[in-house]
């Protein structure tokens, strides 16, 4: 007999909703546990089976911790600004707000149907003005402290789409959507000074319980390098340029220099003879993205400017080239080229026939650049020194002679914070006709997005908000001065930078959150989500959190103490699930056919949480069969409790396996090893089927252990066991170490490596006694009759191997 999942799941979901079973109360004395999911972007496609994998993992933790006596904060909300909704609005003429609301309703219904124990009274939505009021407030604080500023920066401008695109949205010089040409052009944009926090973002990673791979990605993204800045004069011009290098020790090997095509000197120093060639080159590379330009596999291109730089030590003239592999946005936009000891410079020098001068011994520069350490040669006062010594000595020389200094640089750039889009948070700044700008006063927040049907991009590089005259134009009531509101909106990252703080106090209209509540709940204890957010979201959220710490809003330096990335669920054919491949599995269908508990159990049992694993309908059926077996063990044909379940039986049946199960399941849940915990639950059920009676205490303990994974069947069986309250706050089972020990063990006896007998013996038997019992066994006697026993190998608790011939 199997159970009716539709009836049971509906019954308990209604019960939890009606009784607000999972409402979190702030003022209690229990220890806190804050477990967080990366909140989803509510797309038109709805939830897919990948979402519940992470959500089930956090739900198991939340449910177990409640039963262990913790006060648990486990919330859900919506990261609802973003390009797809705007694109939909452009394609259909419908309001993105309506589209978003409809999608959120679908997501909420789907998530509730999976039985997650969220406190829905704390639900947030980044597009709600009561929420983005505080996103805007944080922006104003950043502006006040000089961390939000405007600057001319080269951006990816797509004339056809009439907007600026992020680097991720440009592929091979064309827009990801529609394949339109993209060019680089300078435009005034808002930036946030994340670079001011580079060192702290780097150093504080050490204190976090995060996957090493994610920490490493953040370290690389921040990209701290130590070296020197060196000044070069331009021959015949009153101009200088600066290069940054991590290898100032190789300065004597510099044979030419390279400027980025966008470098302001290019125009000033190019000779008349080279002008046409330089202009043609600049035109040819205009549409390339930074990623493409720095691709190591691509062939190097460049052009000579006709001008020369003066070597700061030797006074030699070094030709100045321009090449697209040097980026204006990285370092100083200029490099000194040392082809003998740098692979890219070597390739470039070979292609354009430029001199290659060896200054570090140890390689064969006729074949390739030598990038290792070695003794310095052809280097005047550095000769004979190794790399470390030579770097130190060269920096001392540069500083003493006013030609350069020690310098630390970062790969990290300031964060480009404006989007020429409608569907985002308005930036609360007013630009006045006299060229000044002022922030919108705090008491006027939120500055709301106006409702409009004019969502088409303007084509001027401004957002569609520029079309809405009555919103854009303002007059200062005191002075009569005219102004225009900032028309750029914030990127989707803004709302997700701080959402975990708002869950703590979601209805506060006086402040971002009550400081006492923040002190109680921060930091987040466990944060689970996809690895695709390893760098940007997590880095931006850490930056905002550190800023809020500096201005006294939050009490901790870091937002997320432990981070875990779940793997991906692939299609049955091991490919990524996608609409175009037609291999997407919809959770609604599975809940209908197999039930939410089965889906939750299957996704946790598929394999390790961090692994990417293919979906299997067979595996799903297996999960359902296990739950049917559990049901039949507890409930008889008539729907009553199995009469084998009794209070205080006179036997220690199931005692050892029960205590082992409590220990293993508890430890595995804590460590997010859900697949092995479920295996142990299966072991217990197999043993229980063999038992003559079922002690009620153990059966109740089993239901408690199962309930975080399969909460609906957990509640139903708890009720069948005679309880009329929810299982959600029942105390978590405990185990007794002394009951884990096996009294008897099975020993394998081998003759010449082949198994010939098995013995049940006391677990604490001595080695001598064990060997004696093995030799006296009838089957063993047969196999060694007439042979000489050469040696006996005994592994206590495991085996005896008799070598005889």
Curated annotation (Swiss-Prot):
GO terms for biological process: leucyl-tRNA aminoacylation. It holds the Pfam family tRNA-synt_1g. GO terms for cellular component: cytosol. A motif ('HIGH' region) lies at residues 40-51. It is found in: Cytoplasm. It catalyses: tRNA(Leu) + L-leucine + ATP = L-leucyl-tRNA(Leu) + AMP + diphosphate. CDD domains: Anticodon_Ia_Leu_BEm (cd07958), LeuRS_core (cd00812). GO terms for molecular function: aminoacyl-tRNA deacylase activity; ATP binding; leucine-tRNA ligase activity. A motif ('KMSKS' region) lies at residues 576-580. Keywords: Aminoacyl-tRNA synthetase, ATP-binding, Cytoplasm, Ligase, Nucleotide-binding, Protein biosynthesis. ATP binds at residue 579. Its EC number is 6.1.1.4. InterPro entries: aa-tRNA-synth_I_CS, aa-tRNA-synth_Ia, Leu-tRNA-ligase, Leu_tRNA-synth_edit, M/V/L/I-tRNA-synth_anticd-bd, Methionyl/Leucyl_tRNA_Synth, Rossmann-like_a/b/a_fold, tRNAsynth_Ia_anticodon-bd. NCBIfam families: leuS_bact. HAMAP family: Leu_tRNA_synth_B (MF_00049_B). PANTHER family: LEUCINE--TRNA LIGASE, MITOCHONDRIAL, LEUCYL-TRNA SYNTHETASE. Belongs to the class-I aminoacyl-tRNA synthetase family. This is Leucine--tRNA ligase.
């Amino acid at each position: 007999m199997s159970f009716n999942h539709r009836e049971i799941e509906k019954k308990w979901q209604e019960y939890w909703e009606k009784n607000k079973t999972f409402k979190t109360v702030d003022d209690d004395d229990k220890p806190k546990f804050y477990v967080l999911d990366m909140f989803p972007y509510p797309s038109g496609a709805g939830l897919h089976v990948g979402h519940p994998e992470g959500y089930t993992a956090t739900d198991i933790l939340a449910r177990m911790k409640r039963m262990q006596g913790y006060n648990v904060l486990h919330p859900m909300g919506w990261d609802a600004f973003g390009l797809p909704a705007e694109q939909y609005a452009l394609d259909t003429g419908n309001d993105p707000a309506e589209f978003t609301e409809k999608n959120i309703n679908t997501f909420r219904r789907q998530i509730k149907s999976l039985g997650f124990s969220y406190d829905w009274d704390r639900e947030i939505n980044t597009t709600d003005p009561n929420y983005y009021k505080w996103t805007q407030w944080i922006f104003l604080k950043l502006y006040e402290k000089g961390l939000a500023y405007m600057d001319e920066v080269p951006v990816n401008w797509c004339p056809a789409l009439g907007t600026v695109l992020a680097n991720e949205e440009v592929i091979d010089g064309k827009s990801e959507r529609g394949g339109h040409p993209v060019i680089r052009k300078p435009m005034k944009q808002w930036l946030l000074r994340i670079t001011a926090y580079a060192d702290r973002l780097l150093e504080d990673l050490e204190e976090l319980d995060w996957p090493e791979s994610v920490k490493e990605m953040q370290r690389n993204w921040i990209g701290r390098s130590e070296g020197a800045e060196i000044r070069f004069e331009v021959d015949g011009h009153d101009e200088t340029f600066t290069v940054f290098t991590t290898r100032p020790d190789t300065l004597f090997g510099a044979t030419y220099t390279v400027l980025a095509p966008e470098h302001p000197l290019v125009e000033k120093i190019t000779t008349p003879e080279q002008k046409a060639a330089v202009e043609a080159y600049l035109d040819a590379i205009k549409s390339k993205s930074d990623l493409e330009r720095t691709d190591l596999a691509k062939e190097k291109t460049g052009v000579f400017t006709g001008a020369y730089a003066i070597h700061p030590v030797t006074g030699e003239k070094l030709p100045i080239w321009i090449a697209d592999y040097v980026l204006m946005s990285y370092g100083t936009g200029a490099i000194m080229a040392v082809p003998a000891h740098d692979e890219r410079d070597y390739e470039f020098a070979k292609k354009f026939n430029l001199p290659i001068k060896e200054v570090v011994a140890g390689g064969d520069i006729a074949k390739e650049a030598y990038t290792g350490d070695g003794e310095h040669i052809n280097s005047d006062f550095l000769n004979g020194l190794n790399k470390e010594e030579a770097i130190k000595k060269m920096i001392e020389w540069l500083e003493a002679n006013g030609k350069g200094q020690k310098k630390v640089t970062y790969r990290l750039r300031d964060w480009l914070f404006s989007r020429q889009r409608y569907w985002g948070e308005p930036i609360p700044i007013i630009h006045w006709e006299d060229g000044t700008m002022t922030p919108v006063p705090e008491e006027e927040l939120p500055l709301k997005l106006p409702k409009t049907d004019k969502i088409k991009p303007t084509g001027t590089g401004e957002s569609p908000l520029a079309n809405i005259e009555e919103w854009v134009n303002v007059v200062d009531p005191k002075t009569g001065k005219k102004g225009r509101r900032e028309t750029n909106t914030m990127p989707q990252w803004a709302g997700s930078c701080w959402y975990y703080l708002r869950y703590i106090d979601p209805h506060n209209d006086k402040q971002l959150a009550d400081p006492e509540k923040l002190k109680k709940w921060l930091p987040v204890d466990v944060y689970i989500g996809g690895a695709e957010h390893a760098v940007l979201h997590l880095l931006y959220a850490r930056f905002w959190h550190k800023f809020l710490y500096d201005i006294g809003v939050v009490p901790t330096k870091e937002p997320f103490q432990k981070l875990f990335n779940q793997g991906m669920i692939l299609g049955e054919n091991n490919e990524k699930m996608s609409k175009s491949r037609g291999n997407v599995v919809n959770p609604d269908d599975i809940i209908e056919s197999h039930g939410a508990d089965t889906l939750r159990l299957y996704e946790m049992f598929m394999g390790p949480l961090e692994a990417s694993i293919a979906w299997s309908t067979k595996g799903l059926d297996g999960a359902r069969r296990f739950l049917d077996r559990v049901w039949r063990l507890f409930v008889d044909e008539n729907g009553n409790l199995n009469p084998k379940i009794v209070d205080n039986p006179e036997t220690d049946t199931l005692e050892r396996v029960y205590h082992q199960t409590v220990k293993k399941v508890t430890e595995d849940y804590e460590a997010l090893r859900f697949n092995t915990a479920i295996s142990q639950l299966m072991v217990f059920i197999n043993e229980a089927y063999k038992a003559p009676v079922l002690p009620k205490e153990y059966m109740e303990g089993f239901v408690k252990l199962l309930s975080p994974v399969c909460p609906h069947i957990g509640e139903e069986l708890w009720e069948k066991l005679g309880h009329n309250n929810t299982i959600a706050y029942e105390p978590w089972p405990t185990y007794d170490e002394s009951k884990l020990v096996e009294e008897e063990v099975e020993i394998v006896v081998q003759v010449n490596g082949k198994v010939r007998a098995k013995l049940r013996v006391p677990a604490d038997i001595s080695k001598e006694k064990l060997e004696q019992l093995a030799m006296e066994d009838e089957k063993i006697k047969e196999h060694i009759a007439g042979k000489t026993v050469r040696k006996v190998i005994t592994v206590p608790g495991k085996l005896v191997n008799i070598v005889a011939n």
